[in-house]
């Protein structure tokens, strides 16, 4: 009874601390951090209590571990992307190498948790080891991963995981068959300080026996030390607030593990006492995946220069990545580096020589924005090297580029062919031809083709948006605004739709409404303030209207500032 009273007191104290911390909470993705505070503190208190157990058999431990792992897998969303499969295979390969030197010969299994917010690793009884994406993302070498895996294997080797199960069974008065209901957080939380330091020592030794450098453990702990200092600092900007999302999940980790400085000192002492010589560390073979993910995250918040830098870093590690090249292309396009974007799109098409209509269209668009006169020449050079059957999309893009270069014959022939075609994709291609006519300043022809295409494919939102731009050019502002009003919501085109409304309202002399629409467009797509970007992609009238609206917005701001200071 006293034990239960003490346990309840600790839990209530933990809950109280979590409730108090809620006052300073920011809106972040769901995290186990708060529960980890509670579990970690509670577990550390309970491990100080004198409790002895009869050690369970290996077979029983393996069975319980398998049941817990199965329950954990069932409660998680499955991520079946190729990148997750690659990391899983890599983690298993490194883990199996390290596990060969483990004292207990258990059926070790290694699992990747693909979340950037899970900056931890943990083990389940019987041989299951989990490593989070957030932790892997912090690593520079395979030796660091080997040290982390060795640490978790040693928690299994020393029966720390099994004893935790027995402790929870006693506290909760559960039959062994009911242990599957245990929250996984009790294993994510750390063990006692002595157990953690022992796992550090023996885990490092395990990694060294496998052929890895002991410096991997030190490097990992040095990263923890840096983050330990950073996670307590207060964010001063929205960007820093965003970067602290993952760091906040570290708080549970630091509360449940020895200080990084203490762990570093212990490993350094171990290296000296064992006389281990320095070994070169191996590159983390999957690091490129995390660099690409960082690049994508920067692209998502329209930090184009940073996204380009990160994508280039990823491609240095692994040059044959279509995903990294796509991030690079979009980042360059967002900065109005259209020739650079075209180069990246071409790399994608060269790496994966299959039909990618959206990449072909983006490649052609980048070429057109870069240089209308020479775009078709470069495109045709690439087409000549395409092996096998050439997708119809190539002909559409080539005809459009030829039109911009002054040759209207290919697009004229293609238009006749498509209007006679029964292919279900024909209306979409006719709509693409309509947009090429818009870029060539033949606005009435653009309206005619796009109207025909939209009538046949009313659900094509981008096509409807293109029609609105063309309607603006022929002074049909009301029709353009109605088209934009009727379009369903799609976050991918909301900014462009807002700018089309702004231009239509501006030209219709509805300036106040135009400036409201301008604000909405800029909030979602800051590229609109780049005159080079706008001029390359839209009509001279649209580009001029955007510049006039930006100037009027600045004039009104200046007027407001002057009025405020009086």
Predicted regions and their residues:
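A Zn2+-metalloprotease active-site environment signal
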Residues: 2-455, 459-469, 475-502, 508, ...
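Acidic, Ser/Thr-rich low-complexity linear motifs
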Residues: 531-536
């Amino acid at each position: 009874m006293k034990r239960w009273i003490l346990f309840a007191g600790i839990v209530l104290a933990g809950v109280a601390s979590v409730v108090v911390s809620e006052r300073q909470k920011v809106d972040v993705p769901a995290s186990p951090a708060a529960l980890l505070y509670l579990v970690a503190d509670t577990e550390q208190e309970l491990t100080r209590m004198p409790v002895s157990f009869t050690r369970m058999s290996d077979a029983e431990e393996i069975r319980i571990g398998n049941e817990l792992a199965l329950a954990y897998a069932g409660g998680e969303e499955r991520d079946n992307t190729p990148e997750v499969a690659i990391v899983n295979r890599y983690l298993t390969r490194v883990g199996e190498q390290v596990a060969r030197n483990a004292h207990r010969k258990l059926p070790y299994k290694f699992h990747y948790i693909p979340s950037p917010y899970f900056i931890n690793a943990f083990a389940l009884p019987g041989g299951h080891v989990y490593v989070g994406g957030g932790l892997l993302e912090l690593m520079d070498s395979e030796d660091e991963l080997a040290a982390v895996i060795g640490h978790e294997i040693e928690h299994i080797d020393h029966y720390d995981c099994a004893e935790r199960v027995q402790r929870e069974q006693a506290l909760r008065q559960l039959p062994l068959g009911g242990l599957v209901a245990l929250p996984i957080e009790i294993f994510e939380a750390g063990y006692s300080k002595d157990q953690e330091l022992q796992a550090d020592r023996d885990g490092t030794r395990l990694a060294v026996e496998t052929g890895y450098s002991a410096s991997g453990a030190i490097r990992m702990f040095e990263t923890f030390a840096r983050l330990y200092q950073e996670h307590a600092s207060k964010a001063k900007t929205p960007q820093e607030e965003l970067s602290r999302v993952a760091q906040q999940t570290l708080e549970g980790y630091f509360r449940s593990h020895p200080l990084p400085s203490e762990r570093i000192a212990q490993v350094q002492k171990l290296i000296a006492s064992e006389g281990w010589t320095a070994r070169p560390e191996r590159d983390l073979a999957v690091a490129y995946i995390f660099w690409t993910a960082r690049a994508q995250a920067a692209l998502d918040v329209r930090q184009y220069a940073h996204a380009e830098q990160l994508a280039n870093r990823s491609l240095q590690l692994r040059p044959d990545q279509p995903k990294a090249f796509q991030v690079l292309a979009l980042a360059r396009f967002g900065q109005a580096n259209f020739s650079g974007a075209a180069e990246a799109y071409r790399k994608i098409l060269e790496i994966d020589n299959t039909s990618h209509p959206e990449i072909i269209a983006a490649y052609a668009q980048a070429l057109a924005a870069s240089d209308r006169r020479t775009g078709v020449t470069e495109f045709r050079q690439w087409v000549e090297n395409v092996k096998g059957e050439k997708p119809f999309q190539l002909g559409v893009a080539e005809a459009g580029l030829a039109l911009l270069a002054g040759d209207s014959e290919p697009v004229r022939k293609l238009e006749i062919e498509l209007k006679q075609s029964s292919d279900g994709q024909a209306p979409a291609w006719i709509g693409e031809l309509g947009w090429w006519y818009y870029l060539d300043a033949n606005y009435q022809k653009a309206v005619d083709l796009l109207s025909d295409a939209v009538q046949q494919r009313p659900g094509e939102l981008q096509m409807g948006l293109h029609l609105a731009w063309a309607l603006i050019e022929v002074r049909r502002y009301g029709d353009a605004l109605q088209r934009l009003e009727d379009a369903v919501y799609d976050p991918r085109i909301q900014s462009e739709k807002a700018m089309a409304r702004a231009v239509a309202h501006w030209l219709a002399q509805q300036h106040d409404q135009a400036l409201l629409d301008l604000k909405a467009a800029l909030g979602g797509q800051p590229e609109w303030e780049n005159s080079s970007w706008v001029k390359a992609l839209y009509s001279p009238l649209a580009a001029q209207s955007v510049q006039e609206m930006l100037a009027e917005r600045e004039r009104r701001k200046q007027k407001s500032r002057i009025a405020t200071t009086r």
